[in-house]
């Protein structure tokens, strides 16, 4: 097929724009949290896999951490078990934890690995149990009890938080040119499994690997101001002000906090990007404009 002059110039322009980013990030680790619409729509799923394979091909080291909340909810519904949430966290009893582990570590994780393989990448699927990757501890949550007029401890069951990341297995895979794909299931010293928020796991993995970037895919354009306009660049000081004035609230609050914690602990930059845009990861990494909100420490 022959390209006309305009098409040829457009392709050349795109490649020229990508070149400095390829040079800058070659050899660097980029942690990508994969979730939301990007996990359910076929075009977005294939676009994501191609983006990850391209990053690896040009010398970057992508590490994928994935969620799977809707898939967990669907299977729980099929087995007749109702989902319960407290402050956005899924209450996870032992039976639910078995299903969470099966869905995240089995179905979802292996689907992503297979998708990357279909686009000629080399991926290895892991949970936090593999290589003692994610050492977890039970999450403690409190809520104010009006009857007691005091804070009350809430038992979420097998919901955990990251205590530490063991990077040995990740370092080995990266050195051997594999793409790690991580399911956010952790384990404590007694061998108990925990369901952990995928954003939190991605942030801690990025910190432990001293990643260049942490990228969190969402179902929004990024962080929006009170007028609904995209905020493209923020630092720690401006994030604090936006939390104070109520611009950042609800479900976006823990995501932003995770991104902020990462840049304050050695990650160069965090990005909240629109996973509903096809090839969102590629556009954020390889173009001047990007497709979301950039967060830095200063």
UniProtKB/Swiss-Prot annotation:
InterPro entries: AceGlu_kinase-like_sf (IPR036393), AcgluKinase_fam (IPR004662), ArgB (IPR037528), Asp/Glu/Uridylate_kinase (IPR001048), Glu/AcGlu_kinase (IPR001057), NAGK-C (IPR041727)
GO molecular function: acetylglutamate kinase activity; ATP binding
EC number: 2.7.2.8
GO process terms (BP): arginine biosynthetic process via ornithine; L-arginine biosynthetic process
Pathway(s) the chain acts in: Amino-acid biosynthesis; L-arginine biosynthesis; N(2)-acetyl-L-ornithine from L-glutamate: step 2/4
Subcellular localization(s) per the UniProt record: Cytoplasm
Catalytic activity: N-acetyl-L-glutamate + ATP = N-acetyl-L-glutamyl 5-phosphate + ADP
Lineage top rank: taxon: Bacteria
Site (Transition state stabilizer): residue numbering on this chain: 33, 255
CC annotations in GO: cytoplasm
One Pfam family matching this protein: AA_kinase
Enzyme class, spelled out: transferase
Record's keyword terms, sorted: Amino-acid biosynthesis, Arginine biosynthesis, ATP-binding, Cytoplasm, Kinase, Nucleotide-binding, Transferase
Protein residues bound to substrate: 68-69, 90, 195
Biological role: Catalyzes the ATP-dependent phosphorylation of N-acetyl-L-glutamate.
Protein name: Acetylglutamate kinase
Source organism: Hydrogenovibrio crunogenus (strain DSM 25203 / XCL-2) (Thiomicrospira crunogena)
Gene, per the UniProt record: argB
């Amino acid at each position: 097929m022959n390209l006309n002059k305009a098409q040829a110039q457009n392709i050349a322009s795109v490649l020229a724009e990508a070149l400095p980013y390829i040079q800058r990030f070659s050899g660097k680790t980029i942690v990508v949290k994969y979730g939301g619409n990007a996990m359910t729509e076929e075009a977005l799923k294939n676009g994501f896999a191609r983006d990850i394979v391209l990053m690896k091909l040009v010398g970057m080291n992508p590490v994928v951490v994935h969620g799977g909340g809707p898939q967990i909810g669907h299977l729980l519904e099929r087995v007749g078990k109702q989902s319960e949430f407290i402050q956005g966290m899924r209450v996870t009893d032992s039976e639910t934890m078995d299903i969470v582990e099966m869905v995240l570590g089995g179905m979802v994780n292996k689907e992503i690995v297979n998708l990357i393989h279909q686009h000629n990448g080399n991926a290895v699927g892991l949970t936090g149990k593999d290589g003692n990757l994610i050492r977890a501890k039970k999450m403690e949550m409190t809520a104010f009890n009006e009857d007691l007029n005091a804070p009350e401890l809430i038992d979420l069951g097998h919901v955990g938080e990251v205590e530490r990341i063991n990077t040995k297995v990740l370092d080995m895979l990266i050195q051997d040119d594999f793409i790690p794909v991580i399911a956010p299931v952790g384990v404590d010293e007694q061998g108990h499994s925990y369901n952990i928020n995928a954003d939190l796991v991605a942030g801690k993995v990025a910190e432990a690997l001293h990643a260049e970037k942490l990228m969190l895919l969402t179902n929004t354009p990024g962080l929006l101001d009170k007028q609904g306009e995209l905020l493209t660049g923020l630092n720690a000081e401006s994030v604090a002000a936006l939390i104070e004035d109520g611009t950042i609230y609800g479900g976006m609050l823990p995501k932003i906090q995770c991104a902020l914690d990462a840049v304050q602990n050695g990650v160069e930059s965090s990005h909240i990007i629109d996973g509903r845009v096809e090839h969102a990861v590629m556009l954020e990494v390889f173009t001047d404009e990007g497709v979301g909100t950039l967060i830095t420490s200063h």
